[in-house]
Amino acid sequence: MEYIDQITNAAVNGESEEIKALLNKEPSLLNAFNSDGWTPLHLACYFGQVDSVKLLLSLGVDIHIKAENSNENMPLHAAVANKQIQAVDLLLTKGADVNAKQSGGGTSLHEASLLGDENMIKLLIEKGADIEIQKDDGKTPLEVAVENKQKSAVHLLTQYSNNKA
């Protein structure tokens, strides 16, 4: 097994000591991509391995690195997509761009709205997410929530929109 496969497996499983050992052998793995276009940080975020995320951040990983695949998403998008609120909070606290766009122009707030994840929507807005931001197709997070019949998200986003006005 190649080092990239070993470190991505360690990131998925939250094996921080293994991550450290592999990075000592091969420092370039910190921001390396696996065959699916993901970095160790993307995978640690997606699987909610907060201790591994903390370790990678402490070692200087690129918090804004885009996946080398059709999603072109950042670690923040990966964490939101799998409802990993602790990882999202950590990334935002460490400087991740809450309004960063992935392929198609979607932001983390668009993804949380699609999923109907109220707690994630609240966190993202509290951390500065733009509720009026549009995807490449012109849709706002509210329109995404409506389109996907996420009633609680529609209600919540409407409240935030009304409070903003």
Language-model features and meaning:
Residues M1-N9, K94, K127, D136-K139, ...:
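Ankyrin-repeat-protein effector appendages
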Residues Y3, G37, N71-E72, G105, ...:
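Start-of-repeat signature of ankyrin repeats
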Residues N34, A67-N69, Q102, K135:
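Ankyrin repeat boundary/linker residues
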